[in-house]
Amino acid sequence: MVAVGLVIAVVGCSSGGDHPAASGGSTGTGGTPSTGTGGTPGTGTGGRSTGDTGGSPNPGTGGVTGIAGSGGSSIAGASGTAGRTGAGGAPATGGISGGGGMTCAPAQSVGGNTACTPPTPPSAKDSVTLDMAAGQGAPAYHGSGFIYGISEDGTQPPTALLTAIKVRAFRAGRGVTGNCGQAAWDTHWKVIKGYYARAKELGVPLEILVSDDYQYSCPLPGDGGDWTTFTTFMTQLIDNVKANGMTGPDVRWELWNEADYSGFWKGTQAQWLDTWKHAYQQVRAAIPGAIIEGPSLSTGAGGSWMNAFLDFCKTNNVVPDYISWHDAGGGGDPVNDQATISKAVSTRGLTGVKGFDLNEYGSTGEQNPGHSAWFLARFDRAGIDGLRSNWAGGSEFFSNMGALVTTNWQPNSQYWIYRRYGDQTGTRIAVTAGTQVDAVAYQDACAGKSIVVVGNKGGTTGSVNVVIKNIPGWLQPGGSTKVLLERMPAGSAALSAPAVVSNAAATVTCNSTVVTINWTTATDGYVVTLTPP
């Protein structure tokens, strides 16, 4: 094996435009130092200069200068791309400049010998491969949506429990069994109002389950040609929504849930489609900019009901803004679903569709750390949103966050999968999936770490390789990187923290390394975190 000569590249970080002044930069031995941005660099004996050195305010595009080589020329630093620019703020020579927000420009290591040989992965049952040189955008946390799962009034759980996992959306109504009329509708409205308040606080949308407010007590819409009761109910709901200031894009109208399931729809397919049309037109007339989604079918993204729905919507000009479906029966895959529904929409020329929403995912058998992590990887790969199914009964329906916590809001092992998913920042890394195993991975030079959430859709036990290629220089100074491997064991009991399997430096060869997981229980989930040693 040929040794690798490492050259470390430095990245510039910026956060809102303000940067601390460096405390005296210095020249490298025998080299020419790069300068900071917006000030005069200091001098010293070895090291690097960062930002301003005793000068005017550091510019928003400024950052860290390059490291001077020993006996050679220095490598220019890369500047961050931040908000405000101070006086005199040009980026460092050779740096990357831009505008807006907090970013780090990830710099790749430069191999000293291009003839080196990457490590050969050991024999394994399955593997995933990461290419850290291939960036695929910022985090969106697509899979962190929930159906009910918080208190009926929306005040619980504590906010920190939700923000840590980057909640993406809520979905709620309130099924009330009893007399059809104002009393039942008022109970249902209190839940919607409470959930909306929490969603607004977190800056995420609420999907209103219209049928959950109506179907359990009232006559089927259009029975005998009579739409009076349903129209009255819709009028009341629309009036409440308008009075509560809920007419913006942070509210989505889901007009009926799982009409292809006999437990939620007793009529014909044609009657359901007419119900969709009546509700759609009533909402559109009252709130022209309303966001409407559907059909939320139990049979997935394809099939006869979905095809009939899309054809009907096109013919009657009642196309939803978001198309939704469920994979709650087991065996679903967001990537395959996205391909199926995209083709169906494109074939029909439904240009008004804004996006897709798999708003119930995961059977009871799939709600474990391993399969949940696999789902998260698939949602990010597909680029569509997902909301966890809620299989709880009674009061737990409003206190389990989709089986992520105990009834007194204590995190369990699945919660920690979503917590590490929420911890991911920076730029998504290209991942080649295995047969049963997939991963979602991000790197963030500003945060100084890369987090890899690894999932198993079921069945695979034994050795699983996580092959990591093109590791950037900031993660491997001196030819090694620190690898933390955490295990989230299957189970519903409270878990204060994941189990640490290992935490040690790993050798990097040809900018690559291999982390091997001994996956003893397929339903466990794993997280790999890389940091500089």
How would you label these PLM feature ranges?
Residues 9-12:
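C-terminal motif of bacterial Sec signal peptides marking the signal peptidase cleavage site
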Residues 166, 318-319, 383-386:
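Glycine-enriched alpha-helix->loop->beta-strand junction motifs that scaffold or abut catalytic
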Residues 20-22, 66-68, 76:
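Intrinsically disordered, low-complexity segments enriched in small/polar and acidic residues
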Residues 153-154, 216-345, 364-378, 404:
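Active-site cleft segment of glycoside hydrolase catalytic domains centered on the general acid/base Glu
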Residues 1-6:
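Sec-dependent N-terminal signal peptides
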Residues 328-425, 470-474:
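Catalytic-core region of carbohydrate-active enzymes that cleave or remodel glycosidic bonds
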Residues 16, 21-29, 33-37, 41-45, ...:
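Non-catalytic accessory regions flanking glycosidase/transglycosidase catalytic cores in CAZymes
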